[in-house]
Amino acid sequence: CDAFLEGHFLLSSGRHSSAYCQMAYLQQYPDKCAEAMKSVADQLRDMEIDVIVGPAMGGIVYAYELARQLGKRAIFTERVDNVMTLKRFAIQPGERCLIAEDVVTTGISSLETKRVIEEAGGVCLGIACVVDRTKADAPSPIDILASAVKLDLPNYLPEECPICREGKLPLVHLGSRKMKEEAKQTL
């Protein structure tokens, strides 16, 4: 489905990479999206989960599809004034919540959703994702419990990016998160 792109990309984490997984391309094919999430759901069937929580934008479709396959409730968090919130839904105290993401590189974005879950009184069990691109020496701060695929793709701090040093490819930001110019430079 052409979701794997090569070039010079600014990731949501602020890191740079020569590879980008444009998961919106997968979402345009419901059968392929369902197939990817089936492999994730199969890894989670014995878990006690009450709610699947998808951070907007990337996690919404995957949370819905995972919840559908597991017979669970699906909700999403979204940004209000650049702060992740639970605007349209509620989590009951003690509900066991699983975060559904499209791609996890550093897990930092998922921390925002974990905070929302815990502030609502829920219990964050971990993350399920389509693509796990975390590094062994830099694991996600939240356990990744299931993924459809694990990819070992390079990513760099901006000041260590060899693509920037080479100066041949422009830096492209394809993600949904609006990043301030100064944040792009310091992350």
Regions found by a protein language model. Name each.
Residues 1-187:
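PRPP-associated nucleotide enzymes
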